[in-house]
């Protein structure tokens, strides 16, 4: 029997595994492959529907008894930085981010390795090799960019690039309606710089400059302390049963 390729994506369901965010819970994911000349268009649609990308896979939670994972996107054009965020921007005013094609480097992997060893030694990515990292960056069929952050140099105004050591990196998908932050990491020795916050603020500024309405942050998990930082970037929308809806929480500390 002859089989013909189909343009419609095929979806698969993973087996249950321990949830990395909530103790005692088990997670399942539904996923599909992002390949071919329609990969970018499909990634846009799936991201708007609550999926995340990892290499050439788009996935979203499909847990049987839990709905704690909520897709979050910042309304970039309406965003106003808080006083604390303005201090973060000022503290990092000596840094500049240069956007490159999705190409890995040994310098990136060295920084990535230092970040994991300091912050996520027991995480699911802790045993990634240099080849694993290269696949994470370059195994993409969508418009993926790597943003490298370094200190400003005398030629930065002309070149748009920094100089010296690599301080932080963001792996980002450029979509029709926004920027999706796939993964980011930084030099753990510069914890006082709040580089995670800085990179999100930088993505908001980039989205605004590009005329894009959203910055996608992935999932917020109510009850997970490691996810609380996402609630600081207001206004934002959450994806629920009725679609994307504006979220407000007066208790969020700004």
UniProtKB/Swiss-Prot annotation:
InterPro entries: Acyl_CoA_acyltransferase, Asp_Glu_LeuTrfase, N-end_Aminoacyl_Trfase, N-end_Aminoacyl_Trfase_C, N-end_Aminoacyl_Trfase_N. GO terms for molecular function: arginyl-tRNA--protein transferase activity; leucyl-tRNA--protein transferase activity. Signal peptide: none annotated. Its main location: cytoplasm. Pfam families: ATE_C, ATE_N. Functions in the N-end rule pathway of protein degradation where it conjugates Leu from its aminoacyl-tRNA to the N-termini of proteins containing an N-terminal aspartate or glutamate. NCBIfam families: PRK01305.1-4 (NF002343), PRK01305.2-3 (NF002346). This is Aspartate/glutamate leucyltransferase. It comes from Mesorhizobium japonicum (strain LMG 29417 / CECT 9101 / MAFF 303099) (Mesorhizobium loti (strain MAFF 303099)).
